[in-house]
């Protein structure tokens, strides 16, 4: 294998770039320049413990996903924390993976964003090499492999925990996949949430979810769930009307990925806030 210096000094591309190979970009990078992978750079010594490593890097917190007939929604709050310190108020944690899928991130924010960028490139590379897009299951499995590759850093406190959602062109349905830090992949049904406020968000969605949701209904339920999570979890940020910071909300349907604009979210959030001035704990489901 030629080094970067060898081919850079000649001003040409190395043989690895000119030889047909596998359709996985991350596997190609592992063989050619593993130091550029998120998991390819060792942590410095002296951190002391996994919790200490986790406290030096901003952490993204709560992500929710809701399936509805003909699509799926993915939403995330905007707060990142370092221990008990608010590191950022307007971080974005929901990204398009490709035209028909999206990924939300919880865990170590910097590493997670890097994994998302590599995942986006992975899907684009596969499509260019193979001439077709990966299936929804194929995309979910590729992401699982990438998360598994980050296990060593996760064991040192820098975990990446994504939530993957996509529109399945074969079935015409929205699908949701969750992961653990070992790369274990699990398909979820109807709705799911990850991150520090996930237990509160999921509890809210249990009462709010309806199988006949429209995309607009799902957006309302997602913002309500994130509001409940922020109410009980200090690491989750609620909507900030003064700074005009709203959750990132995206829907994926047969028309592709669409992020809801802030103007649309502003109206939705204000209506929810108005209702909560009357009922602070949010909408209540009937007992029977």
From Swiss-Prot:
Coiled coil: none
Keyword Hydrolase: yes
Pathway(s) of this molecule: Protein degradation; proteasomal Pup-dependent pathway
Subcellular localization: Cytoplasm
Propeptide, residue positions: 1-60
Classification via InterPro entries: Ntn_hydrolases_N (IPR029055), Pept_T1A_subB (IPR000243), Proteasome_sua/b (IPR001353), Proteasome_suB-type (IPR023333), PSB_actinobac (IPR022483)
Keywords for the protein's UniProt record, in alphabetical order: Autocatalytic cleavage, Cytoplasm, Hydrolase, Protease, Proteasome, Threonine protease, Zymogen
UniProt-listed PROSITE patterns: PROTEASOME_BETA_2
GO annotation (BP), single: modification-dependent protein catabolic process
Pfam families in the record: Proteasome
Active-site annotation: 61
Reactions this protein catalyses: Cleavage of peptide bonds with very broad specificity
Record comment: activity regulation: The formation of the proteasomal ATPase ARC-20S proteasome complex, likely via the docking of the C-termini of ARC into the intersubunit pockets in the alpha-rings, may trigger opening of the gate for substrate entry. Interconversion between the open-gate and close-gate conformations leads to a dynamic regulation of the 20S proteasome proteolysis activity.
Assigned protein family: Belongs to the peptidase T1B family.
Binding partners and assembly: The 20S proteasome core is composed of 14 alpha and 14 beta subunits that assemble into four stacked heptameric rings, resulting in a barrel-shaped structure. The two inner rings, each composed of seven catalytic beta subunits, are sandwiched by two outer rings, each composed of seven alpha subunits. The catalytic chamber with the active sites is on the inside of the barrel. Has a gated structure, the ends of the cylinder being occluded by the N-termini of the alpha-subunits. Is capped by the proteasome-associated ATPase, ARC.
HAMAP family (alphabetical): Proteasome_B_B (MF_02113_B)
PANTHER family: ATP-DEPENDENT PROTEASE SUBUNIT HSLV, METALLOPROTEASE TLDD
Protein name as catalogued: Proteasome subunit beta
Provenance organism: Catenulispora acidiphila (strain DSM 44928 / JCM 14897 / NBRC 102108 / NRRL B-24433 / ID139908)
């Amino acid at each position: 294998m030629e080094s970067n210096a060898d081919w850079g000094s000649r001003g040409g591309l190395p043989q690895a770039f000119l030889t047909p190979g596998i359709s996985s970009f991350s596997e190609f990078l592992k063989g050619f320049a593993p130091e550029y992978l998120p998991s390819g750079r060792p942590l410095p010594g002296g951190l002391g413990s996994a919790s200490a490593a986790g406290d030096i890097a901003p952490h993204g917190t709560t992500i929710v996903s809701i399936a509805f007939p003909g699509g799926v929604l993915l939403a995330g709050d905007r707060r990142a924390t370092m221990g008990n310190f608010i590191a950022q108020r307007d971080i974005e944690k929901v990204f398009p993976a490709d035209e028909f899928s999206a990924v939300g991130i919880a865990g170590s924010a910097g590493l997670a964003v890097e994994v998302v960028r590599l995942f986006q490139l992975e899907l684009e590379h596969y499509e260019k090499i193979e001439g077709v897009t990966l299936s929804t299951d194929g995309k979910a499995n590729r992401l699982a492999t990438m998360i598994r590759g980050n296990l060593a850093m996760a064991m040192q406190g820098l975990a990446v925990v994504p939530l993957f959602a996509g529109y399945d062109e074969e079935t015409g349905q929205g699908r949701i996949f969750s992961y653990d830090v070992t790369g274990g992949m699990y398909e979820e049904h109807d709705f799911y949430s990850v991150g520090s406020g996930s237990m509160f968000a999921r509890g809210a969605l249990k009462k709010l979810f309806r199988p006949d949701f429209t995309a607009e209904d799902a957006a309302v339920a997602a913002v309500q769930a994130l509001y409940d999570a922020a109410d009980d979890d200090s690491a989750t940020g609620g909507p900030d009307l003064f700074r005009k910071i709203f959750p990132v909300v995206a829907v994926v349907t047969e028309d592709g990925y669409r992020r809801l604009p802030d103007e649309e979210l502003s109206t939705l959030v204000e209506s929810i806030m108005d209702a909560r001035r009357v009922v602070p704990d949010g909408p209540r489901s009937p007992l029977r």
